[in-house]
Amino acid sequence: VYTKGKKAFINGRIEICAKLNAAKGAWPAIWMLPEKAAWPSGGEIDIMERLNNDSIAYQTVQAHYTYTLGITENPKSHSTGPIYPDRYNVYAVEMYPDSLSFYINDMHTFTYPRIQTKEEGQYPFNQPFYLLIDMQLGGSWVGAVVPEDLPVEMEVDWVHFYQRKSKK
């Protein structure tokens, strides 16, 4: 799924209900990129990444501040949360003008806030982002694919977006 040029999201909660089948070398991901800005300065919102047979999912933000400058702990830019490996799980991010809050199965995993800093590019997330749902096979983070584990799928049940009403 690739919504660039079709649907972009800002100021709301996006939820994806998906079952992540396991295989060595499988790297399913649900993530977002800015509609009109370049990476990494425009940011990246990783709503879910799972590696191989893990029983956790990774949630991360990337930006010039976290990726290029390597500042990942002030504020913390990543977390993990437990998943049910053989069931559907709900992955979510709430997008606010001054923070991103991440959830797995309605359990809050972490919040990435806008902070005061002299460094550039700390919070580029107050802009429209498009959604990507994909399955990569192999890579530096997951290692080589084991052919005997294939085929492998990510089954998506639904995607919901809840737009916050603007204050008048």
What residue ranges belong to the model's regions?
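GH16 jelly-roll
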Residues: 1-168
